[in-house]
């Protein structure tokens, strides 16, 4: 029987954490994953994290393990959209003449969710289009 009602969701929370917080420049450790799970009232041990990451790999998530000395980390290497593609989408939305400012902000927030939190910061750009006001996100 699960220790908490969320225990069965552990692997989904691990996937969410990896997608949101890791990229090639920002690997996450098993300790960080365990702390994240604990914040959601889910208990986990290192060995179960390793097996859950293997299961996510089997599912098709491209998770890379990196090692620096005694520190081991993981990051999601391949995503549906690469950062330059997301920048292109953001620029296209910002420069569109028929999308309202409110809808532009909403769409950009959704596009940012397709990247890690670190890469999403790089999507905050300014685009100036003739006959449109400056849009800064």
Feature-to-residue mapping (PLM):
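Bulky hydrophobic/aromatic content
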Residues: 80-134
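Short, basic/aromatic recognition patches that contact phosphate-bearing ligands
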Residues: 1-88
């Amino acid at each position: 029987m699960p220790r908490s009602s969320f225990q069965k969701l552990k692997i989904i929370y691990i996937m969410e954490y990896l997608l949101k917080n890791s990229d090639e420049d920002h690997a996450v450790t098993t300790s960080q994953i365990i702390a994240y799970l604990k914040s959601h009232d889910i208990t986990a041990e290192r060995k179960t994290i390793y097996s859950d990451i293997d299961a996510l790999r089997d599912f098709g998530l491209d998770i890379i393990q990196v090692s620096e000395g005694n520190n081991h980390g993981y990051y999601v290497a391949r995503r549906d959209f690469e950062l330059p593609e997301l920048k292109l989408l953001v620029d296209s939305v910002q420069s569109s003449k028929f999308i309202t400012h409110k809808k532009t902000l909403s769409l950009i927030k959704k596009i940012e969710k397709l990247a890690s939190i670190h890469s999403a910061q790089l999507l905050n750009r300014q685009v100036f289009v003739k006959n449109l006001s400056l849009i800064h996100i």
